[in-house]
Amino acid sequence: MNKGLLHNKLIDWYEVNHRILPWRETDDPYKIWISEIILQQTRVAQGMEYYHRLITRFPDIQSLADAEEDEVLLYWQGLGYYSRARNLHKAAQLMKNHEIFHLSNVECLKLKDEEIFAALKSMPGVGDYTAGAIASFAFDLPYPALDGNVYRVLSRLYDCEIAFDTTQGKKHFRQLAEELLDREHPRLFNSAIMELGALHCVPTAPDCHTCPLNTWCKALANNTVELLPVRKPRPKVRDRYLEYTIYITPERTTLIHQRKGNDIWKHLWEFVETTSVDFKNDNIDNLRGNQLPAALQGENSTQHYTTLHHSTQPQAISLTHVLSHQKLHARFVIKNVPELPEIPDTLVVSLSDLDNYAFSRLTLRAIEFLAQR
């Protein structure tokens, strides 16, 4: 393999075809770090909006570190995988007391590459890939950046049948990426190979005959492009049943509480959870009635509601919402009450103030229904 020619072909393609993205227009490590955390589990189109939101509200390490976690979660609301937001906040609090994160890029380049990489990797939520991406994009250091797009390009380029999301696979692909890396132009090379995977070497039906790397692509030669990359078997999605009560007073106040423990949606707010119940054998059809307006229906969520004849009697909203490892079946029972019950660890809030708190996407759909009542 003529790596020099491959590098040139790839970079030439990138110069003509790349997208204009805000984090590519800067070498600010903070902004690049924010973008990389967002893009860990989020597509660029959705991530762009959140990048601008976060950078506008938290323009530097100090402002992010000094914020309350609740506010960080609120600005993250809707992106999912909320541990990313919590780790972002924890990392900022560590960074503000860490000398290396207050140096200019020029001053950082006086340090050893390994020092910069180690400092980055020591932060919560930052692994090898994210540390390598920041080191490369902010400081132009010779570290590979491995995301899903790069795994796909490498697996096809080398016709590699090792599952990239296993311990063995991660080690193997990192070695391939380090060997292929253009060490004279790591920032440009990493941007180019990521963009190739995002725009050209796509999961299905890629246009291999116009690919700049087709001369070297072993999967194309062996007719295995559509079989790659290989992933480890995904765990079975399990059903989980939840029930909540939404108390509403004549003054339009309700009760919410903050989730604790290490379960899903840690530190997000929700209505009073009656219990984690198995109501799959209930006559849920009695709760369904009319379908919610299309505006309230998400790609991975189906929603139904029923309105009973008397406003003092309960109403119920039934929703399903799919996470990566769980299918949630939730029922929100709306109870109009003269006054709120006393329930430990709950907060009394006005319905009009709910947008000041961070909720899961599932609960947000219930809130959207409430707003239309």
Regions found by a protein language model. Name each.
Residues 2-4, 8-9, 13-209, 213-216, ...:
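Catalytic cores of DNA base-excision repair glycosylases
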Residues 1-19, 25, 198-373:
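Intrinsically disordered, low-complexity, charged terminal extensions of DNA damage-control enzymes
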